[in-house]
């Protein structure tokens, strides 16, 4: 069931921080393309990317807002997910020194799934909006 798979991946990896689930859900040589020109290959690099986001926002909670897919078990599936997340900028990481500001972000992720594994991921979210929320005027 595609819906259950997608919800389980997001909940287990992003919300429960169970990074060992990456190896279960993703092909070992998964190809990733993301915001700000990020491109990498492999589950180790994917794990590093996820941990880098969570290092900046350790209380990040992600939810799926919309989910669409097409395909079949034989040929694989193409999945599109619109998600939202809320977290507090409490940790050092890609977004500088902690500001303790709450940040809302949303993004779109597309997956190509073959043989019950994610083989390609495209994820886009507005990193400028994150920086504006972190560095914006203090009221």
Question: What residue ranges belong to the model's regions?
Answer:
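C-terminal and inter-domain tail/linker signature
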Residues: 1-139
């Amino acid at each position: 069931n595609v819906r259950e798979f997608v919800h389980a991946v997001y909940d287990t990896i992003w919300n429960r921080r169970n990074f060992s689930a990456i190896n279960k859900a993703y092909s070992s040589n998964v190809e990733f393309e993301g915001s700000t020109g990020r491109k990498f290959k492999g589950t180790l690099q994917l794990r590093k990317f996820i941990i880098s986001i969570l290092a900046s926002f350790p209380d990040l909670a992600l939810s799926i807002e919309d989910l669409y897919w097409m395909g079949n078990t034989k040929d694989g599936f193409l999945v599109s997910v619109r998600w939202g997340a809320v977290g507090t900028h409490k940790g050092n990481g890609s977004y500088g020194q902690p500001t303790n500001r709450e940040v809302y972000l949303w993004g779109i992720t597309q997956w190509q799934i073959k043989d019950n594994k994610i083989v390609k991921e495209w994820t886009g979210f507005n990193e400028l909006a994150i920086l504006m929320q972190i560095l914006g005027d203090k009221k």
